[in-house]
């Protein structure tokens, strides 16, 4: 009887550990940005994602170069849906963020796209997504970058404050996802004053990691107010790395993507080159949830 109990317990332990390990293996988040122009680089990055171990992918904005005005806009098919078809066919969940080029059209079109493509997620231009105690906040930073969108800012700020307060005790690790960075070690300038004020007040010092596109590089810019800024924006038009990278930072203009694995309050991340599928840079961030 004791032997049977031991065997049964061992079987349960094996099944539990096996499921635990599988969940950890599947907990791989990847990030690309600025992949809206049809060219060989875009194809290279899409192919790398299609054949990657990513279980969830986030697009960091500038989904197309010209923006799309409706669900029937040819730009949508030609610059996004057709080039990304090999990846979309994998049914890997694909979460969208909108950038400044998407605002050249109507970025809410992607809400309609998400209804037609089960693997695409875009419930709004700003939203949250939780995976257990890992919390993602997706933001629309273009409305802070462009003065003529000032009337749209209040609703997002109020929403953000409410959600941070609501989730504060539930998030062991927090990631904010948006299009525009606050600063850069490359040739892009710091965010303009109105955008910088928003990011300084509401993002840096609140989240563990802030992941963006816009600057067409792969970059680990280090911490500011204990928030790590990462950039993954070489989906189609790499360019803008410094001649010499500052010590402790990483900044290259190679096609690729960012890969993150989060366990508890620890995130291990790697920048992957699309051409050779090699690790270009890796690092670790210990988080504090939402502050």
For each predicted feature, which ranges?
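Bacterial N-terminal signal peptides that target proteins for export
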Residues: 1-9
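N-terminal active-site segment of His-dependent metallophosphoesterases
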Residues: 20-75, 184-185
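C-terminal structured domain segments across diverse proteins
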Residues: 167, 180-182
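A short C-terminal boundary segment appended to hydrolase-like catalytic domains
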Residues: 249-291
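Residue-level marker for buried hydrophobic side chains located in beta-strands
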Residues: 29-31, 57-59, 96, 176, ...
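Active-site glycine-centered loops adjacent to acidic/histidine catalytic or metal-binding residues
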Residues: 34, 61-62, 99-100, 139, ...
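Hydrophobic h-region of N-terminal signal peptides that target proteins for export
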Residues: 11-21
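Extended active-site neighborhood of metal-dependent phosphoesterases/phosphodiesterases
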Residues: 69-174, 189-209, 215-263, 267
